Amino acid sequence: MSRSIKKGPFVDKNLFKKIQAGDNKHQIKTYSRASTIIPEMIGFTINVHNGKTFVAVYIQENMIGHKLGEFAPTRKFISHAGAAKVGKK
């Protein structure tokens, strides 16, 4: 279910203040994975927390409308051992 249009997109107020006041030379750290990417964020590098570390996300024009958490995966993919990896006796 999408967010109501009359409410507008959610952006963490502290993150929004840093973007309004800051220059895009330094990276901004945030834990707010639910914040929506807005046009004012283009050109910034935002470090998004994935539960363990911060993942650097460079904001581009085609990311507008998505959430920050979409670009910082929380799970590490480890494939199962295949037949080539397992040695036979």
Swiss-Prot record:
GO molecular function: rRNA binding; structural constituent of ribosome
A Pfam family it matches: Ribosomal_S19
GO cellular component: cytoplasm; small ribosomal subunit
Keyword Cell membrane: no
Keywords associated with the record: Ribonucleoprotein, Ribosomal protein, RNA-binding, rRNA-binding
Keyword Methyltransferase tagged: no
UniProt record, GO biological process: ribosomal small subunit assembly; translation
Record-linked HAMAP family: Ribosomal_uS19 (MF_00531)
Entry-linked PANTHER family: RIBOSOMAL PROTEIN S19P FAMILY MEMBER (PTHR11880), SMALL RIBOSOMAL SUBUNIT PROTEIN US19M (PTHR11880:SF8)
Function of the molecule: Protein S19 forms a complex with S13 that binds strongly to the 16S ribosomal RNA.
UniProt family annotation: Belongs to the universal ribosomal protein uS19 family.
Protein name: Small ribosomal subunit protein uS19
Gene: rpsS
